[in-house]
Each structure stands twice: as structure tokens, then as C-alpha cells.
């Protein structure tokens, strides 16, 4: 059938359809590339540069990834412009409306934006959670933001012009005191019901905490005195070479703290022997392997070729030969057994048992042990003998059980919980973990202000439990809608760590003895450890005769005589090398005295001397004597006098905080900061609970009773509600204890970020940090967030009334980034600089002010 005219015309029109579509496609691609270069046309480039580079890059890659449109039945279409790409003439519109933007009507359609310009991540605090840094604010509760104190410059803006400088400074100082006082009051009200806060400052809780710490100190002191009496410390030196012996002493102290006996201490010797055996096995294993290799190499060339062929032929026959040998051995074993069993088998035949002549091998094996027990008995009481033997075996086992085995009290298992909210108490975690077998104790760290006062928890169990099963079961439990997220805590790997070997030098050792003795005296006096019944400070036995080692002996007379004779003493003759350098001189007598002091500090007061730190709450931790720093090996080179002096100076500075007593504010400063008077607060409480209902009608809201006058209400409150009065007084003491503590916990003081300076010397004050553009972590949660600098997002600030385009555009290049900021790989876009005309003599818009 012939084609119609219309079909023929259509074919003629579409004769070059493929070539035309390919041309259109290539032309469209070329146009697209040219359009993306914003420096082709001045006006179009100015408008397009205001858009986000990230959007252009994303849309371009998305268009190129899809297949081109079909042009079969229609002329080539013009490239479609998306509605959200057209921002009109708004030069400050960012590429995306961010999901927490105040201008966004709904959720944004872009990827999660960071907190700002990529370079601003350096300025953020490490405490911001990862969800917040990725832009997922709805997943993070940032808590109450801390108010920022005004700078003096900002404070001046709120004052009148008539105020002079001295008055302004005075008012600013008053403002700072009021601000801190308000901060302190708010912090106290926010945390006064939390356990960690009450244990520090509440009068009732402080007394309990002191009693517990005193009891633990006494326990640790008794453990140390036991070790000293039993001569555990005599042969141990705090050198890195004696690490196993040091660990053994620390473990022995832990066993005594846990209530262990001398029998329990034997397990340390057993562990030491096992360690030696394992080390010997490891040494023997490589030796035996090398010997085998040597013997095989010697035997290999001695065998002739014929033997090798015979071996190759006999190899497949070996398993059969082995089976035959096994059968022969079994037969040889069975023959004597049958000879001994003959009288027994005859008796069984007479008693009516089976008369089969051939017994199976299994029968012979099972029946063989029975006649051994029966043969010695000839009176027919063969069944009683095995019972007696069983009884004797049970008695022996009981005797073995009665002998007490040493317990590994120094080893524990523990679970670590990283983020415990401050409102969860220690008693709640204890009640949760107490249901599991082997539970011992719970340790909670101090709250961390930089991490929203979260705490770390260590739950200790006995070594015999399966800690992974307990950890898995705890992982599925929520406490106050909080996931505990526990993990198994590993044992300490390096319990003994070393510092510089210069500490072996005799002058440094003598200085350390002096410092350690002072520190022991200060800590003992603070803890009232050696105070007897007569309230007289008894002397610590470890400090007896300590002054004998603090006095330096010199040969002054000999040196004077030699000097007058014009000779130098032999001890000071310069050796080879630099005369200002000296070799490290070791004095074992002084070191022995020092080590006893350092063991006392470590075991009793949990002070690691060479690490210049105190381990808090160590009695509640999984390892009650965990880590200790000791002296390292002798330095290979000689040391100078300057190095020795510098070491002593820096070490004393690091050790100074351990000597410092808890500082408190003076009476004048505390009154200035808002210290409360108990009597005044009681009067305020009485006045607040005395309500006038009418003429000669007064009400006590505490009980609901009515009285004729206020004096009767007052008398009623003091008589019937004395416990309320006591609560008010305790609350006042509670607040004052927090107030006078110079190291009281508080919200971190946030300082406003200083705007960085651009390459051209222009500060970013032209629009980066307006009041609504502080750090995101400081903005209140669940509040609409202002737009933040993102990928290509323009800085958000009020439009410049002096308007035009040149100052605003030139300052930020119309692209919402830092002025004059050099491009890098993170900022996608055209790497070439924009060629433009700029009048260098014209002032910038920022200079109009």
C-alpha cells in the first residue's frame, strides 16, 4: 500500500532530523557553558554572580547527567529555567533557604548546611555535637544559652552622651558585678537539686561526703602501714626497670584495701610464677623450632636416592600399617585381661548368665574394671568397697575445698558510660546495676561544663562475671529517657610510665625529698589523718628523721685550704668535654628514702608525684591504684647546671596546685557578690507567709489558719513550722557555700568572636557578626535560626541605605563570602579572577560613616 502525501511530506521534513538534533544538542551544551561564565556580559554576570555557586554547580552536573530531550515532533526547545533559580534583583539571596532560616517558609531542599563559611569551623567549640555541626539542629538539645557580657564599647552605646569617662567606668564595673551575681543566682537555681551540686555545697551532704572520704583515707593508710611493716617497700625502687615489682606492690595495696588477707596476697606470687613460665615457654619455642630445622637439613643429604624412592612408594601404605599396629596392641592388652577374668566368668555362668564363648570387645572393656574391685574381697561384700572409696574421695575433696584459695581481689571488670546527664543520681545507677551478679561499686566523674555538665560513669563488677553479657543487657535499658550507651572498659595496659631520667641526679633527688615531705605534711594536715585523742598532731612515722637527708654536706674547710694554696679541689677538676656539664650522679640511699615517701603519696593520698597530679575518687574506680609514674633510665649524655635548675623550677611550679588550699572569697567580696544573711532571709520567709485578708484577718498559707494580727502569724510560724525555718537557714548556708568558693562551677564565659580581617585590610564588621549571627550553639533551642553563611550563601545583614551596588557588591564580590578571600578547592566555581574597573581614589562605603 502506497504512502499518503502527508506521510511523504513528513519524511522529507525529517530527512536531516538526526543531524539537526545533534547540532542542537551540541549548541545547547556550548551555550550552557558560555552562560556559566559570568564575565561574558557585565549586566548578566553581575546578576548571576549573586547566586550561590553551589547551586550552579549542582544544577549543571544534574543537567549534564541526564539524557537530552527528544526533538522528534517539535522544534528545539529553549532551556527551561527553574523557578527557584530566579531571584530577581535581590543581590543577597543565598543558594538555599536554610531549614532554620527565619525567611524560609518551610524546610529547605538543599543538603545540610554547615554553621557558616567553611573556614568558620575553626572558630567553633569542640563541645558542639556532630549533629549540630552537620546542620541537624532538630536532633540536638543545646540547652539554655549562656548570656554574653557586654564589652565596654557596647556598654557605652547604652549610656547617655552626658556621662563622662570616670562615671562610665564606674557604671561598667557595677554592671559586671550585677551580671556575675545574676549568673551565679541562675546557676544555683538550675543545679541546686542535682546530686553532684548538693554533695559539694549542701551542709548535710557535705558532712556525709567528708565522713566517707575520711573512712577511705583511713583504709588506704592501714593498707600502706601493713605493706611497710611486712617489708614490701624495702627492695623496690621507683625505676622503670622494676615495673613488675612496682605493679606487685600496688596490687598488694589494692588487695588489702578490698579486705584481703595474707593468703590472698599469695596470688601475686602465683601470677609472677605463671608469667615466668610463659616467658620461658616463649623463649624455648623458637629454639626448638630452629633445632628441628637444623636436624632436618642434616638428615636430608645423608639419605640415598634409593631410600627416597622407597619412601615415596611406602607413603600411601602408612595409614593401613598404623591401623594394623593398633589392632595388634589391643589384642596383646586383651590377652592378660582374659586370663585374670577366667574365675569371674565361670561364676557368672553358674549364676545363669549368658554362656556365649565369644564376648565382644566392648563387653571386655566395660567389664574389666569391675573384677579389680571385687577380687580382693572374698566374703561376698564386693559392692561395699567402691562406696568406701567414693566416701574417702569426697572427704579429700572437702578438705581441699576447706583450704582457702587466694582470691584475685585486685582484678575487676567494669563498664564505662560516657554521657550521664547531671540529673541522674549515683543511687539510680547503683539500683540499676545491682541486679546483676558480681556488682561492686559505681564511680561518677565531675560534671564537665564544656559538655553540658555531662558525667562519666564506671560500674565495677567482680572478675568472675561475663562482663559482655551484662554490658549487652544494660545497653537496652533507658534511664529517665536517656540511653546509657555502655561499653566494656579495658584493663590498664601501661600502669607504670617513666619520665626523664634526670630525676636520678642527686641534687634533684634531695629537692624531691624536701617537696614530697612538705606535700605529705600538707595533705595529712588537711585530712586530719594523724590527730590523736588529745587533739595533738602526732608525727607521721614516715617523716621521722627526714631532716637528716635534707641537709647537704660540703667540704668547705678543705676547699678553703686548697684555694688558699692556689690549688683547685680534685672533685671540681673539669673532666673531658664541656666544663659546664656534669654527669648524672646517683645516690641509692637518698633514692630509697624518696621512694618510700612517693609510695605513701600514691597509696594513701592518690597523688602521682612525678605526674604532678591527684587521681580523684580513686576508691570508687575499677582499679583503686592504677597508674604510677617513675624515673626513667639514666640519660646517655651529660647534663648542664642550667638544665638541672630549669627542671627543678618547672617541677615546683607544676606541683604548686597540690599545695594550694581551697580558696574562698573574702567577706567584703562575698557581700559584694550577694552573700545572704540567714536572719534577713528568715524575716523575708515570715513576711512572705503572712497574708492580710482584711481588717484584723491574717492568714498563714503554710497551715491555712487565720489570725487577728501579723504578730500571731509570726509566732505560729516559729512554733509550728520550725522545720521550715531550718530549711530556709540551710538554703542560705547552701548558697553561701557555693558563693564563697573561688573555683565554683559555672557556665563557660563566652566571648564574642572577633571578625577576621580580609586580604584588603577590610574587617568583616561590614556584615558578618550582627547580633543575630552569634555562634549557633549560643542561640536558644527551638527558635527560628537566621540564615547563616553556607556554600555560596550571602551574608545576612540589613540593606545598606547608601545603597547602590558598588560598595556592597565589590566588598563581597556578590557571592556571599569573605572579602578578598582567596578561592580554594572547597569553594566550587570559576577559578579565574573577575576583570572589572574600579576607581581606586573613590572611598569605600564603609568610610561614609
Curated annotation (Swiss-Prot):
Domain of life of the native organism: Eukaryota
Job of this protein: Acts as a mediator between the cap-binding complex (CBC) and the primary microRNAs (miRNAs) processing machinery during cell proliferation. Contributes to the stability and delivery of capped primary miRNA transcripts to the primary miRNA processing complex, thereby playing a role in RNA-mediated gene silencing (RNAi) by miRNAs.
Record GO biological process: primary miRNA processing
Primary gene name: srrt-a
Compositionally biased intervals (Acidic residues): 354-364
Alphabetically ordered keywords of this record: Cytoplasm, Nucleus, RNA-mediated gene silencing
Quaternary context: Interacts ncbp1/cbp80.
Family recorded in the similarity comment: Belongs to the ARS2 family.
Name used for this protein in its record: Serrate RNA effector molecule homolog A
Gene3D superfamilies found in the cross-reference section: 3.30.70.330
Amino acid at each position: 500500500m502506497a504512502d499518503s502525501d502527508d506521510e511523504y511530506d513528513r519524511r522529507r521534513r525529517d530527512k536531516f532530523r538526526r543531524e539537526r538534533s545533534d547540532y542542537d544538542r551540541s549548541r545547547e551544551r556550548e551555550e550552557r557553558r558560555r552562560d556559566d561564565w559570568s564575565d561574558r556580559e557585565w549586566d548578566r554576570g553581575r546578576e548571576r554572580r549573586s547566586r550561590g555557586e553551589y547551586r550552579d554547580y549542582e544544577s549543571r552536573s544534574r543537567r549534564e547527567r541526564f539524557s537530552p530531550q527528544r526533538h522528534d515532533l517539535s522544534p528545539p526547545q529553549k532551556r527551561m529555567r527553574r523557578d527557584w533559580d530566579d531571584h530577581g534583583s535581590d543581590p543577597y539571596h543565598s543558594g538555599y533557604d536554610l531549614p532554620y532560616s527565619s525567611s524560609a517558609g518551610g524546610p529547605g531542599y538543599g543538603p545540610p548546611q554547615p554553621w557558616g563559611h567553611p573556614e568558620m569551623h575553626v572558630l567553633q567549640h569542640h563541645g558542639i555535637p556532630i549533629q549540630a555541626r552537620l546542620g541537624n539542629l532538630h536532633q540536638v538539645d543545646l540547652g539554655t544559652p549562656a548570656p554574653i557580657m557586654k564589652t565596654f564599647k557596647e556598654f557605652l552605646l547604652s549610656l547617655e552622651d552626658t556621662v563622662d569617662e570616670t562615671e562610665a567606668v564606674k557604671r561598667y564595673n557595677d554592671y559586671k558585678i550585677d551580671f556575675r551575681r545574676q549568673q551565679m543566682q541562675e546557676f544555683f537555681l538550675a543545679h541546686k537539686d542535682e546530686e553532684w551540686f548538693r554533695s559539694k555545697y549542701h551542709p548535710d551532704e557535705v558532712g556525709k561526703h567528708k565522713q566517707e572520704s575520711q573512712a577511705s583515707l583511713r583504709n588506704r593508710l592501714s593498707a600502706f602501714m601493713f605493706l611497710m611493716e611486712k617489708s614490701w617497700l624495702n627492695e623496690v625502687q621507683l625505676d622503670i626497670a622494676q615495673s613488675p615489682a612496682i605493679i606487685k606492690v600496688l596490687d598488694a595495696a589494692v588487695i588489702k584495701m578490698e579486705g584481703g588477707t595474707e593468703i590472698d596476697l599469695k596470688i601475686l606470687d602465683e601470677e609472677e610464677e605463671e608469667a615466668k613460665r610463659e616467658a620461658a615457654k616463649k623463649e624455648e619455642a623458637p629454639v626448638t623450632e630452629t633445632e628441628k630445622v637444623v636436624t632436618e637439613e642434616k638428615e636430608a643429604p645423608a639419605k640415598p636416592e634409593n631410600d627416597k624412592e622407597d619412601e615415596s612408594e611406602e607413603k600411601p601404605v602408612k595409614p593401613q600399617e598404623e591401623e594394623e599396629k593398633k589392632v595388634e596392641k589391643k589384642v596383646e592388652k586383651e590377652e592378660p585381661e582374659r586370663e585374670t577374668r577366667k574365675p569371674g566368668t565361670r561364676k557368672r555362668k553358674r549364676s545363669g548368665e549368658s554362656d556365649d564363648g565369644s564376648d565382644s570387645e566392648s563387653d571386655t572393656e566395660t567389664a574389666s574394671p569391675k573384677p579389680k574391685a571385687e577380687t580382693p574381697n572374698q566374703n561376698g561384700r564386693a559392692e561395699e568397697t567402691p562406696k568406701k572409696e567414693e566416701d574417702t574421695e569426697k572427704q579429700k575433696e572437702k578438705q581441699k575445698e576447706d583450704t582457702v584459695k587466694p582470691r584475685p581481689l585486685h582484678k575487676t571488670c567494669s563498664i564505662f558510660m560516657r554521657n550521664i546527664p547531671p540529673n541522674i543520681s549515683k543511687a539510680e545507677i547503683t539500683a540499676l546495676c545491682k541486679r546483676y551478679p558480681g556488682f561492686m561499686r559505681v564511680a561518677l566523674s565531675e560534671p564537665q561544663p564544656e559538655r553540658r555538665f555531662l558525667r562519666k560513669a564506671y560500674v565495677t563488677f567482680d572478675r568472675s562475671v561475663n562482663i559482655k553479657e551484662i554490658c549487652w543487657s544494660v545497653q537496652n535499658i533507658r534511664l529517665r529517657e536517656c540511653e546509657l550507651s555502655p561499653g566494656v572498659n579495658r584493663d590498664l595496659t601501661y600502669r607504670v610510665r617513666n619520665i626523664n631520667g634526670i630525676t636520678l641526679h642527686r641534687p634533684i633527688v634531695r629537692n624531691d625529698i624536701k617537696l614530697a615531705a612538705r606535700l605529705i605534711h600538707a595533705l595529712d594536715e588537711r585530712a586530719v589523718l594523724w590527730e590523736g585523742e588529745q587533739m595533738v598532731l602526732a608525727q607521721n612515722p614516715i617523716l621521722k628523721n627526714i631532716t637528716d637527708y635534707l641537709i647537704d654536706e660540703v667540704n668547705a674547710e678543705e676547699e678553703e685550704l686548697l684555694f688558699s694554696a692556689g690549688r683547685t679541689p680534685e672533685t671540681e677538676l673539669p673532666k673531658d668535654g664541656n666544663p659546664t656539664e656534669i654527669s648524672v650522679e646517683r645516690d641509692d640511699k637518698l633514692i630509697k628514702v624518696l621512694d618510700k615517701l612517693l609510695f605513701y603519696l600514691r597509696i594513701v593520698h592518690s597523688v602521682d608525684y612525678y605526674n604532678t597530679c591527684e587521681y580523684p575518687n580513686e576508691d570508687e574506680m575499677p582499679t583503686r591504684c592504677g597508674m604510677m609514674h617513675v624515673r626513667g633510665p639514666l640519660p646517655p649524655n651529660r647534663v648542664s647546671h642550667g638544665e638541672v635548675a630549669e627542671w627543678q623550677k618547672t617541677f615546683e611550679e607544676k606541683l604548686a596546685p597540690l599545695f594550694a588550699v581551697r580558696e574562698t572569697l573574702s567577706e567584703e567580696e562575698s557581700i559584694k557578690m550577694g552573700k545572704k544573711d540567714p536572719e534577713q532571709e528568715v524575716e523575708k520567709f515570715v513576711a512572705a507567709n503572712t497574708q492580710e485578708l482584711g481588717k484584723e484577718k491574717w492568714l498563714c498559707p503554710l497551715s491555712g489558719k487565720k489570725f487577728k494580727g501579723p504578730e500571731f502569724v509570726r509566732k505560729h510560724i516559729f512554733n509550728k513550722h520550725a522545720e521550715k525555718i531550718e530549711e530556709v537557714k540551710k538554703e542560705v548556708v547552701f548558697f553561701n557555700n557555693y558563693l564563697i568558693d573561688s573555683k565554683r562551677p559555672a557556665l563557660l564565659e563566652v566571648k564574642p568572636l572577633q571578625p577576621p580581617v580580609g586580604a584588603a585590610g577590610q574587617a568583616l564588621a561590614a556584615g558578618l557578626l550582627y547580633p543575630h549571627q552569634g555562634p549557633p550553639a549560643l542561640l536558644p533551642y527551638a527558635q527560628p535560626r537566621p540564615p547563616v553563611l553556607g556554600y555560596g550563601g550571602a551574608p545576612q545583614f540589613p540593606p545598606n541605605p547608601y545603597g547602590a551596588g558598588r560598595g556592597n557588591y565589590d566588598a563581597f564580590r556578590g557571592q556571599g563570602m569573605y572579602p578578598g578571600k582567596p578561592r580554594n578547592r572547597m569553594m566550587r566555581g570559576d577559578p579565574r579572577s573577575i576583570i572589572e574597573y574600579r576607581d581606586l581614589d573613590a572611598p569605600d562605603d564603609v568610610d561614609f560613616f
